[in-house]
Amino acid sequence: MNIRLLAVFALLTGISLPVRAEGDIEWRHRATQGAVTLSANPLGLASRTAFYSARGFAAEAIRPYAQACGFSFGMQNGGTATLSTRLADWRAVGTDGRAVRLRLPAEWDLQWAKAHVPEAARIAFRWAQFQAENVFEAGDWIMGMATLEAPLSGSFRLVARYHDEKGNHEIVLDKLACGHDSSAN
């Protein structure tokens, strides 16, 4: 793998090199429900701007995405049953009870199309996102980025819903906060 790509990925996910497997990532937030694990790391403006600029986005085009409250998520099915999840069913809930949905990758893609972002950059964006709908067989996992539709101040919780043969379930990540870095000020 290209060392620059690996270094940017490490920066975005907050991991130390060398990266060998998903288990090597130092996740800041992690929760488990049954055999399903959800992990998250907040992402700052500078890291997302650098990541997507290196993939063909003009700085002004990627700015709204980079300024949004964003995370790198990992989800793993450690069980034997198939499960599914839809990003549209996930919510961030502030301490005041205000719920904010996650902005779906297709919504960002519409914005990129209107801004005439090159197709190659848009493909790179889609590949780096937590997919809008996922089906996990036993042992499957996914990593990807996602943003909130609107910022929440202070800490909040993320309620991630998924479905398996036993019904609907939720995993809750508590005490999340939007990532901040010196470039965001």
Residue ranges and their predicted role:
Residues 1-5:
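Positively charged n-region of N-terminal signal peptides that target proteins for export
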Residues 6-14:
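Bacterial N-terminal signal peptides
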Residues 16-18:
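N-terminal signal peptide c-region/cleavage motif recognized by signal peptidases
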